[in-house]
Design a protein with these regions (language model features):
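Positively charged n-region of N-terminal signal peptides that target proteins for export
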Residues: 1-4
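Short helix-onset patch at the extreme N-terminus, typifying the N->h transition
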Residues: 6-9, 74
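Hydrophobic h-region of N-terminal signal peptides that target proteins for export
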Residues: 8-18
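Rhodanese-like catalytic fold shared by cysteine-dependent sulfurtransferases
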Residues: 18-38, 48, 52-107, 117-182
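Structural scaffold elements adjacent to functional motifs in cytosolic proteins
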Residues: 42-44
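Short, surface-exposed ligand- or partner-binding patches at beta-edge/loop junctions that are enriched
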Residues: 111-112
Length: 182
């Protein structure tokens, strides 16, 4: 029993170390971009339609959606359109690396709305696909929702926008994922 507990503790410790290793704060990410570190690719993994309504940071090198919205499929149980994983996600990331002359060992930083639904899973998928230095922005672009009070439900707690980092309601046509030109 004692050996089982020790093994479980070691396993938990390694999971905790992995979680720390894979996540970056918005401020840490911005500092890397400001230093113009040559071996970094910063990608926004949100659907371009979400970016159009929520905002975009031009600090991002490219928009490569991890999940896409299928507006022909309605999920009645959740009251939303169906989301599906972008089947070309890994190949599109490879293309962005190649455009910048970067290898699979480059630090790839992904950012979604909150960090947990697409940011972390996209970084994990990239690691599984041979990109050992994939990471994600903890709390993402909008951050967490406030739990209580008159602003309950609003994403005003943390994340890129709420950290005072640069963003705009406008998209950069040269960086956004577009099916008409790419």
């Amino acid at each position: 029993m004692k050996k089982l507990l020790i093994a479980a503790a070691i396993g938990f410790a390694s999971l905790t170390a992995h979680a720390t290793d894979i996540g970056l704060s918005a401020a840490e990410t911005y500092a890397k971009i400001q230093k113009a570190e040559p071996n970094v690719l910063f990608i926004d993994v949100r659907d371009p339609v979400e970016i159009m309504f929520v905002g975009f940071s031009d600090a991002v090198h490219a928009n490569v959606p991890f999940m896409l919205v299928d507006r022909t499929q309605w999920n009645a149980e959740k009251g939303v359109f169906r989301l599906y994983r972008n089947p070309d996600f890994v190949n599109q990331v490879k293309l962005e690396l190649a455009r910048r002359g970067l290898s699979a060992d480059a630090e790839i930083i992904t950012m979604c709305r909150s960090g947990s639904e697409r940011g972390e899973p996209s970084a994990a998928l990239l690691r599984e696909s041979g990109f050992p230095n994939a990471r994600y922005v903890i709390n993402g672009f909008q951050g967490d929702a406030i739990k209580d009070g008159p602003q309950a439900g609003f994403r005003l707690k943390n994340g890129w926008q709420n950290s005072g980092l640069p963003w705009s309601p406008r998209m950069n046509a040269d960086k956004i994922h577009r099916v008409d030109s790419r």
